[in-house]
């Protein structure tokens, strides 16, 4: 049985209700399956890489088998997590939508007559291995990827132990933690020397692991939600021409 350390950064100490509901269901299901679970939250840390490094530092002080990153705005199903543990991969994560609407994809979905538009509105946090053509992905099998987000990522302890060999160390100067402690900078935001892109801390983490022979997998079976805000805009009369409201031909009014 596995010992899972759930880590969630919470800027401002805030989280969404769907996250709390999902987390409580996860704890119940992991415990029922014989797994141990512990949770750690990082409040009011505005520097994301430092927050993730500090949570990883806490994880490494204990004896848990897995560090499970879950962002505070993610909705998830406990059965998907159990399958991730059973997959027995060094790094495996779920692919979740970005907080944006892909309008070009929505337009294409409407033109194609898609019935379930909600599944065609998002862009996803993932970099595929082969992004030049079509990639065949089975829903029931892990799929190797170049990088994915730490919003929903399960990492084995052995990954961090191996990465220590080539990861820089900095001394903690935050008064909220023990000053002077040496912390591994697993999560950084460097410029990729090959592409010139500024990498996010999670993509950098994946790139470093793969650069030294590791593999990263996505769990296509995960059904995730990403809580966000949206400004609903519009006007009853969008042009200078008169319009007819109601009746199915014009804007609906209540």
Residue ranges and their predicted role:
Residues 12, 33, 100, 239-242:
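Cationic, hydrophobic amphipathic alpha-helical membrane-interacting segments
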Residues 1-50, 254:
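N-proximal low-complexity "stem/linker" segments adjacent to membrane-targeting elements
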Residues 31, 85, 209-210:
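Anion (oxyanion) recognition and catalysis
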Residues 63-75:
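Short beta-strand-to-loop acidic/aromatic patch adjacent to the donor-nucleotide binding site
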Residues 73, 90, 215:
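Residue-level detector of anion-binding/catalytic polar loops
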